[in-house]
Regions:
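A conserved alpha-helical element in kinase catalytic cores
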Residues: 207-231
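C-terminal cap/substrate-recognition subdomain and adjoining C-terminal extension
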Residues: 63-169
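Substrate-recognition element of Asp-dependent hydrolases with the DxDx(T/V) motif
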Residues: 26, 35-76, 97
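ATP-binding glycine-rich phosphate-binding loop
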Residues: 178-201
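Short, glycine/serine-rich, charged loops/turns that create anion-binding
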Residues: 56, 120, 141, 203, ...
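Juxta-kinase regulatory segment immediately upstream of eukaryotic protein kinase catalytic domains
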Residues: 163-186
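Short, surface-exposed acidic
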Residues: 1-6, 13-16, 83-93, 180-185
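Metal-dependent phosphoesterase signature
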Residues: 2-40
Length: 231
């Protein structure tokens, strides 16, 4: 973003790109690693999740006039945000704001305990509610921001807000990947930053589940390497 905006006509180019990415090509977007697990862990703890987005109805310079808000909701629907058997987020808990000021008012109105954003400008506003704890997502210098937690992965965000991963978390995540109900889960020794669990289903089938370090912060292809070794 910053690189584009520094170029000649950079602001216009950036706005055009935003219109394409969040409009016509929104269907191709994927969730960040760790987001799905975070939402599932919020659900089993009965935490309410709100999505408050500063998003205009249409992209700038978009001749097709594709509704960015409608595309965002369609994408969330596809990713099962509103499915009560999955993330279970209430569709009414999604808010779109025309301006940053409107976004800040909505955050204050909802009395959020935490708010996560990847734009520093949101937290630098004097009108940001003082009772809401801030998490800035990304790689920023902590000393540049007052009273703001800076984290660069959703696993770290989950640990900050929800605490350490529990067996119930692991069971919930595994249930979304497997067709068989889980009977028992046991943590066994893991090496380094990896965590290994033994899972038994109700039909007595046994599986190993391994949780690797986040690829966002650790680029080593550990899963691929181990899989190739086993072949």
């Amino acid at each position: 973003r910053d690189h584009l905006r520094c170029q000649p006509n950079g602001e216009k180019t950036w706005m055009k790109l935003q219109g394409l990415v969040y409009g016509k090509h929104m269907h191709g977007a994927e969730m960040m690693p760790g987001v799905a697990n975070f939402f599932l862990s919020c659900k089993i703890r009965n935490h309410r999740v709100f999505i408050v987005s500063h998003k205009t109805e249409y992209g700038h310079y978009d001749p097709e006039k594709i509704s960015l808000r409608r595309e965002a909701l369609k994408w969330m629907e596809t990713k099962r945000f509103f499915d009560p058997e999955y993330f279970g987020i209430n569709r009414k808990n999604v808010y779109f704001a025309d301006t940053r000021e409107e976004k800040l008012k909505k955050i204050a109105q909802l009395k959020c305990d935490w708010f996560i954003d990847d734009l520093p400008e949101v937290f630098e506003e004097n009108r940001f509610p003082s009772d809401t704890k801030k998490i800035l997502f990304g790689s920023y210098e902590p000393e540049l921001f007052h009273n703001t937690t800076i984290l660069n992965s959703w696993r770290k965000i989950s640990e900050k807000i929800l605490g350490q991963t529990t067996d119930k978390d692991i069971t919930t995540w595994a249930n979304r990947m497997m067709e068989k109900p889980i009977h028992h889960i046991e943590k066994i020794a893991g090496r380094g930053n990896s965590k290994v669990y033994k899972i038994k289903t109700t039909s007595e089938d046994a599986y190993a589940l391994k949780q690797y370090p986040n690829l966002v912060t650790d680029k080593r292809p550990r899963l691929t390497t181990e899989f190739n070794t086993l072949q």
